[in-house]
Amino acid sequence: EPIEEDRFVGGDIYEVVQSPYGTRVIIGDVQGKGLPAIGAGFAAIAAFREAAVREPTLTGVVEALEDAVVRHNVFSAQTGEAERFVTALILGFDEGGDVQAVNCGHLPPRLLHEGRASAVPLDRTSVPLGLAGLSRESRAEESFALPPEATLLVVTDGVTEARDAARDFYPFDQRLGDWAGHGPRELLDALHVDLEKFTGGVRRDDVAALALRRAPGDGRPRPTAAAEEARPVAGAVSD
């Protein structure tokens, strides 16, 4: 139930796709701002929408994303624009209780379950999209459990790097501990209100947040998203 239909928010991107291989999700952050960043974001989103339903493996989806960002950068260089990279977390949900993940330099997801909140330990974090040529290691898929009634929260660094008037960082994980019993929509609403209060309404980066919970019975995740450009909405904000 996305609150905002636009899946590209300033420098942040997110999308949820139902595929023959299960539900696939991306959340990401494009380096930089302005029209060049928007172009790289659109390239990544378009590639994800196609590859998510075509590629049987999550690493295949990520390879398609890498190719798309690299092609975009080649075109950008020819037109005198700076090259861009994209941090991204790509998730796959099947009929079982596990989640597959490929982390391309993005923040790890947070798991809220049974009154506790914790970061999901992902050990194979790789370089951002567009930079695979600089790494000797290939990207690898990991998996972790998503128990029934648990909520998985993924955000961009506009949340974790938000600052107050004293230049202190937003205490993201501390707040999640206070909200560990919330459902997806209630969680995003609380995050939005608290970010507004903490920053005094002054933010210097885009913000996107996506809360996912498996729908009862079919094993598929039910996403709740919040993201908007320039002004706040219930759940998350973006500047």
Regions found by a protein language model. Give the residues of each.
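Sensory beta-sandwich core in regulatory modules of signaling proteins
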Residues: 25, 153, 209-210
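Short, surface-exposed charged micro-motifs
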Residues: 13-15, 90, 143
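Catalytic core of PPM/PP2C metal-dependent serine/threonine phosphatase domains
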Residues: 39-116, 121, 127, 138-139, ...
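Active-site-proximal, acidic helix/loop segment immediately C-terminal to a metal-coordinating Asp/Glu
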Residues: 37-51, 125, 143-202, 218-235
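Short alpha-helical "switch" segments that flank and position catalytic residues
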Residues: 21-28, 35-44
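PP2C/PPM family metal-dependent serine/threonine protein phosphatase catalytic domain
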Residues: 1-7, 107-144, 169, 230-239
